[in-house]
A protein has these predicted regions:
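N-terminal secretory signal peptides that target proteins for export/translocation
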Residues: 1-10
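Conserved beta-strand hairpin/beta-sheet module of binuclear metal-dependent hydrolase folds
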Residues: 40-90, 195-207
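Bacterial N-terminal signal peptides
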Residues: 13-24
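Active-site neighborhood of phospho(di)ester-bond hydrolases with catalytic His/Asp-centered motifs
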Residues: 75-77, 100-108, 126-129, 186, ...
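Divalent-metal (often Zn2+) His-rich catalytic cores of metallo-beta-lactamase-fold enzymes
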Residues: 198, 227-278
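Active-site HxH/HxHxD metal-binding segment of metal-dependent hydrolases
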Residues: 89-169
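C-terminal regulatory/interaction regions
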Residues: 275-316
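Metallo-beta-lactamase
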Residues: 30-38, 133-186, 191-192, 200-201, ...
Length: 316
């Protein structure tokens, strides 16, 4: 297990003290985000189905935590320091145990920018082996979004990358005290940085953005890889899935199959469009439209998905 050295935290934690304290002061009057216990010791806050635009406030992803007998694991920390602070405050309403791990399911900004709230000597950050690089590559872009939509200056858009890294198709088990969780990394799918977290005690899987319920699924990696990863997840022995966006469900196979069917339809219709020399804009206007009534934010996201996969599939 890789851990930060003590002087690392002295160096990097101290500059955060003022920022974290100041942020708590700013947002002290804000309503706390709410959590639901979806299985014993598993708490989830469900983000809103909003786009990253003028309506964005850093709270669109599902975030939460798992409580063991000795410690706690945070699963995704939200889209801002504000959300991270509210998550940290909410945890203390349910347990006084220390947070031992913060796990990021992937690189997207709505899942990672609360990490700084949990920096401490005994906290390890866990993620995909590609996550540190991906975070660094997107840093400036994310800072612009946080400044424009959240009014967060760059010195408060703090990235904390994982120090425990998991390679694709491998997993590691972490014990929270009579409660083991398994973190599994995948090859490119939703992104190049996807991991899932399985609570072995309750057979609950945190899928991150490998599963969307209600909201239109997002492809920021590879559509073929996404379809393949869903096939792997469908083979798991689990009872419940917590998606990255949308309502946790015990009808998890139906949820994954619905998502996979959308991807297969989109893949086939985009391939047909390319074979017929149809241009990108016409394909955006037509492909996948039979799915439009099944998903929220479809008119926004379906076109983005096509814009992502069309040029990739042209080279196949």
């Amino acid at each position: 297990m890789i851990r930060y050295r003590k002087n690392f935290f002295l160096k990097h934690s101290l500059p955060l003290i003022f920022i974290l304290t100041f942020s708590v002061f700013i947002y002290a009057s804000s309503p706390s985000i709410e959590f639901k216990e979806v299985a014993p010791g598993i708490f989830v806050h469900q983000g809103e189905h909003l786009d990253v635009d003028e309506t964005y406030h850093g709270d669109i992803a599902n975030i939460g935590f798992i409580v063991g007998e000795e410690s706690i694991a945070v699963i995704d920390s939200g889209g801002s320091l504000k959300i991270g602070n509210e998550l940290k405050t909410a945890i203390r309403k349910f347990s006084k145990l220390p947070v031992r791990y913060v796990i990021n399911t992937h690189v997207h900004l709505d899942h990672i920018y609360g990490n700084a709230s949990f920096v401490g000597e005994n906290v390890d950050f866990i993620g995909h082996v590609e996550l540190p690089k991906a975070m660094a590559l997107r840093k400036e872009f994310y800072e612009r979004i946080n400044l424009e939509y959240l009014d967060v200056p760059n010195d408060q858009s703090i990235q904390i990358a994982p120090n425990i890294l998991i390679k694709p198709n491998e997993n590691k088990i972490f014990d929270l005290g009579n409660r083991k969780i398994k973190v599994t990394a995948y090859s490119i799918a939703h992104t190049k940085t996807d991991v899932t977290i399985e609570d072995l005690k309750t057979k609950t899987l945190w899928a991150g953005d490998l599963l969307f319920t209600e909201r239109t699924p997002v492809i920021d990696g590879d559509i073929h890889g996404f379809i393949d990863v869903i096939d792997k997840i469908l083979m798991l022995d689990i009872d419940q899935v917590i998606p990255g966006h949308g309502t946790p469900t015990k009808k998890w196979k139906e949820a994954f199959l619905k998502e996979q069917n959308y991807f297969k339809l989109l893949r086939d219709e985009v391939r047909l469009a390319i074979d017929n020399d149809q241009d990108l804009q016409l394909t955006i206007d037509t492909a996948g439209q039979s799915e439009s009534e099944k998903w929220e934010l479809f008119d926004i996201q379906n076109g983005r998905n096509i814009n992502k996969i069309f040029p990739m599939m042209e080279w196949e």
